[in-house]
Amino acid sequence: QAIEKIVYWLKKAETVAENEAQKAVISKLIRFYETGNLKDFDEYAILWVKDLDSRIDFVNGFTESYGDPLGMKASWESLVNFKDIESTHRTEIISSNAQWFEDHSPVDKAFKKDEVKGVSAKVITAAILGGDLYPSTAIGINLPNSNWIRSHHGSKSVTIGNITDAYNKAAHGNGFNEEFVYSDTEKQLIDKYADLTGELHTDLHECLGH
Protein backbone atom coordinates (compact mmCIF):
# COMPACT_ATOMS: atom_id res chain seq x y z
CA GLN A 1 0.00 0.00 0.00
CA ALA A 2 2.85 2.38 0.78
CA ILE A 3 4.44 1.81 -2.63
CA GLU A 4 1.05 2.27 -4.31
CA LYS A 5 0.85 5.72 -2.69
CA ILE A 6 4.39 6.52 -3.87
CA VAL A 7 3.41 5.56 -7.42
CA TYR A 8 0.21 7.61 -7.17
CA TRP A 9 2.12 10.78 -6.35
CA LEU A 10 4.89 10.08 -8.84
CA LYS A 11 2.25 9.85 -11.58
CA LYS A 12 0.95 13.25 -10.44
CA ALA A 13 4.50 14.63 -10.60
CA GLU A 14 5.00 13.13 -14.06
CA THR A 15 2.23 15.36 -15.44
CA VAL A 16 3.99 18.54 -14.26
CA ALA A 17 7.61 17.54 -14.92
CA GLU A 18 9.98 20.40 -15.58
CA ASN A 19 11.15 18.97 -18.91
CA GLU A 20 11.11 15.79 -20.99
CA ALA A 21 14.28 14.45 -19.38
CA GLN A 22 12.76 14.72 -15.92
CA LYS A 23 9.52 13.17 -17.15
CA ALA A 24 11.47 10.17 -18.45
CA VAL A 25 13.22 9.81 -15.08
CA ILE A 26 9.93 9.79 -13.18
CA SER A 27 8.35 7.38 -15.68
CA LYS A 28 11.20 4.89 -15.30
CA LEU A 29 11.06 5.13 -11.50
CA ILE A 30 7.33 4.38 -11.61
CA ARG A 31 8.07 1.34 -13.75
CA PHE A 32 10.60 0.10 -11.19
CA TYR A 33 8.09 0.42 -8.36
CA GLU A 34 5.52 -1.47 -10.43
CA THR A 35 7.85 -4.29 -11.52
CA GLY A 36 10.46 -4.50 -8.76
CA ASN A 37 12.98 -5.27 -11.51
CA LEU A 38 16.49 -4.05 -10.66
CA LYS A 39 17.17 -3.53 -14.37
CA ASP A 40 14.44 -0.88 -14.34
CA PHE A 41 16.06 0.73 -11.30
CA ASP A 42 19.46 0.83 -13.02
CA GLU A 43 17.88 2.42 -16.10
CA TYR A 44 16.16 4.96 -13.84
CA ALA A 45 19.48 5.76 -12.10
CA ILE A 46 21.21 6.33 -15.45
CA LEU A 47 18.47 8.69 -16.64
CA TRP A 48 18.52 10.47 -13.28
CA VAL A 49 22.28 11.03 -13.23
CA LYS A 50 22.19 12.42 -16.77
CA ASP A 51 19.54 15.03 -15.95
CA LEU A 52 21.70 18.00 -15.03
CA ASP A 53 19.48 20.78 -16.36
CA SER A 54 16.39 20.51 -14.15
CA ARG A 55 16.28 23.05 -11.34
CA ILE A 56 13.95 20.80 -9.34
CA ASP A 57 15.33 17.34 -8.54
CA PHE A 58 14.67 14.47 -6.16
CA VAL A 59 15.96 11.31 -4.54
CA ASN A 60 13.37 8.55 -4.20
CA GLY A 61 13.90 4.88 -3.53
CA PHE A 62 15.56 2.16 -1.50
CA THR A 63 18.92 3.86 -1.55
CA GLU A 64 21.27 3.46 1.41
CA SER A 65 22.12 0.26 3.30
CA TYR A 66 23.64 1.86 6.40
CA GLY A 67 21.11 0.15 8.67
CA ASP A 68 21.93 -3.36 7.46
CA PRO A 69 25.06 -4.94 9.00
CA LEU A 70 25.60 -6.90 5.77
CA GLY A 71 25.15 -3.81 3.60
CA MET A 72 22.64 -5.62 1.39
CA LYS A 73 19.20 -4.29 2.33
CA ALA A 74 18.54 -0.62 1.62
CA SER A 75 16.06 1.63 3.42
CA TRP A 76 13.57 3.87 1.63
CA GLU A 77 14.24 7.59 1.51
CA SER A 78 13.08 10.63 -0.39
CA LEU A 79 14.24 14.20 -0.83
CA VAL A 80 12.67 16.85 -3.06
CA ASN A 81 14.86 19.86 -3.69
CA PHE A 82 15.59 22.85 -5.89
CA LYS A 83 18.93 24.23 -6.99
CA ASP A 84 20.54 27.16 -5.17
CA ILE A 85 21.87 29.01 -8.23
CA GLU A 86 24.28 31.36 -6.44
CA SER A 87 25.86 28.72 -4.20
CA THR A 88 26.04 26.20 -7.05
CA HIS A 89 28.36 28.59 -8.89
CA ARG A 90 30.81 28.10 -6.00
CA THR A 91 30.80 24.31 -6.41
CA GLU A 92 31.16 24.58 -10.19
CA ILE A 93 34.37 26.60 -9.75
CA ILE A 94 35.80 23.94 -7.42
CA SER A 95 34.76 21.06 -9.68
CA SER A 96 36.18 22.69 -12.81
CA ASN A 97 39.56 23.04 -11.05
CA ALA A 98 39.77 19.42 -9.91
CA GLN A 99 43.05 18.85 -11.73
CA TRP A 100 44.69 21.77 -9.91
CA PHE A 101 43.71 20.32 -6.55
CA GLU A 102 44.99 16.89 -7.60
CA ASP A 103 48.32 18.30 -8.77
CA HIS A 104 48.81 20.36 -5.60
CA SER A 105 47.50 17.90 -3.01
CA PRO A 106 50.06 17.08 -0.26
CA VAL A 107 50.36 13.37 -1.07
CA ASP A 108 53.03 11.28 -2.75
CA LYS A 109 53.06 11.42 -6.56
CA ALA A 110 52.52 7.66 -6.64
CA PHE A 111 48.96 8.25 -5.47
CA LYS A 112 48.14 11.09 -7.86
CA LYS A 113 46.26 10.69 -11.12
CA ASP A 114 47.39 12.26 -14.39
CA GLU A 115 43.84 13.20 -15.32
CA VAL A 116 40.93 13.80 -12.99
CA LYS A 117 37.54 15.42 -13.34
CA GLY A 118 35.38 16.91 -10.64
CA VAL A 119 31.97 15.32 -10.29
CA SER A 120 28.75 17.08 -11.25
CA ALA A 121 28.06 19.15 -8.17
CA LYS A 122 25.46 21.63 -7.01
CA VAL A 123 24.06 23.20 -3.87
CA ILE A 124 20.39 22.49 -3.23
CA THR A 125 17.62 23.60 -0.92
CA ALA A 126 15.71 20.69 0.57
CA ALA A 127 11.96 21.25 0.27
CA ILE A 128 10.87 18.00 1.91
CA LEU A 129 12.51 15.00 3.56
CA GLY A 130 10.98 11.53 3.78
CA GLY A 131 11.78 8.05 5.03
CA ASP A 132 15.30 7.57 6.38
CA LEU A 133 16.21 11.16 5.47
CA TYR A 134 13.66 12.48 7.98
CA PRO A 135 13.88 14.29 10.37
CA SER A 136 17.57 15.02 9.82
CA THR A 137 19.82 14.25 6.90
CA ALA A 138 23.43 14.34 5.86
CA ILE A 139 24.73 17.69 4.61
CA GLY A 140 25.83 16.13 1.33
CA ILE A 141 24.71 13.33 -0.96
CA ASN A 142 26.56 11.51 -3.73
CA LEU A 143 24.58 9.04 -5.87
CA PRO A 144 24.01 6.58 -7.45
CA ASN A 145 25.75 3.93 -5.38
CA SER A 146 26.26 1.43 -8.21
CA ASN A 147 29.95 1.56 -9.08
CA TRP A 148 29.42 0.48 -12.68
CA ILE A 149 26.94 3.31 -13.25
CA ARG A 150 29.31 5.80 -11.62
CA SER A 151 32.15 4.52 -13.80
CA HIS A 152 30.27 4.67 -17.11
CA HIS A 153 27.74 7.46 -16.56
CA GLY A 154 29.04 9.57 -13.67
CA SER A 155 27.41 10.61 -10.43
CA LYS A 156 25.56 13.53 -8.90
CA SER A 157 26.95 15.24 -5.86
CA VAL A 158 24.97 17.77 -3.85
CA THR A 159 25.45 19.90 -0.78
CA ILE A 160 22.17 20.58 1.03
CA GLY A 161 22.53 24.27 1.72
CA ASN A 162 19.59 24.94 4.03
CA ILE A 163 20.38 21.85 6.14
CA THR A 164 24.00 22.97 6.49
CA ASP A 165 22.81 26.44 7.47
CA ALA A 166 20.40 25.01 10.05
CA TYR A 167 23.12 22.85 11.62
CA ASN A 168 25.46 25.86 11.75
CA LYS A 169 22.86 28.05 13.42
CA ALA A 170 21.99 25.32 15.92
CA ALA A 171 25.68 25.07 16.90
CA HIS A 172 25.99 28.78 17.67
CA GLY A 173 25.91 29.60 21.35
CA ASN A 174 26.38 26.02 22.53
CA GLY A 175 29.31 27.03 24.73
CA PHE A 176 32.02 25.28 22.71
CA ASN A 177 33.85 28.45 21.66
CA GLU A 178 33.74 29.93 25.14
CA GLU A 179 35.23 26.76 26.58
CA PHE A 180 37.88 25.86 24.02
CA VAL A 181 38.78 28.86 21.82
CA TYR A 182 41.93 30.58 23.08
CA SER A 183 41.36 34.27 22.36
CA ASP A 184 38.67 36.80 21.53
CA THR A 185 40.38 37.37 18.17
CA GLU A 186 39.93 33.71 17.28
CA LYS A 187 36.30 33.80 18.43
CA GLN A 188 35.63 36.77 16.16
CA LEU A 189 37.25 35.01 13.20
CA ILE A 190 35.19 31.89 13.87
CA ASP A 191 31.97 33.90 14.09
CA LYS A 192 32.80 35.61 10.80
CA TYR A 193 34.18 32.74 8.72
CA ALA A 194 33.26 29.39 10.28
CA ASP A 195 30.01 28.91 8.35
CA LEU A 196 31.56 29.75 4.98
CA THR A 197 34.65 27.61 5.54
CA GLY A 198 32.40 24.77 6.68
CA GLU A 199 30.45 25.03 3.43
CA LEU A 200 33.68 25.06 1.41
CA HIS A 201 34.89 22.00 3.33
CA THR A 202 31.72 20.13 2.33
CA ASP A 203 32.04 21.36 -1.27
CA LEU A 204 35.61 20.08 -1.48
CA HIS A 205 34.54 16.70 -0.14
CA GLU A 206 31.56 16.35 -2.47
CA CYS A 207 33.19 17.79 -5.61
CA LEU A 208 36.69 16.37 -5.29
CA GLY A 209 36.62 13.67 -2.61
CA HIS A 210 34.10 11.54 -4.46
Positions of the model-derived regions?
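Active-site recognition of the HExxH zinc-binding catalytic motif
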Residues: 19, 200-210
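Alpha-helical scaffolds flanking conserved acidic
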Residues: 196-198
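Contiguous, non-catalytic segments that form substrate-binding/exosite surfaces or channel walls
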Residues: 1-190, 194
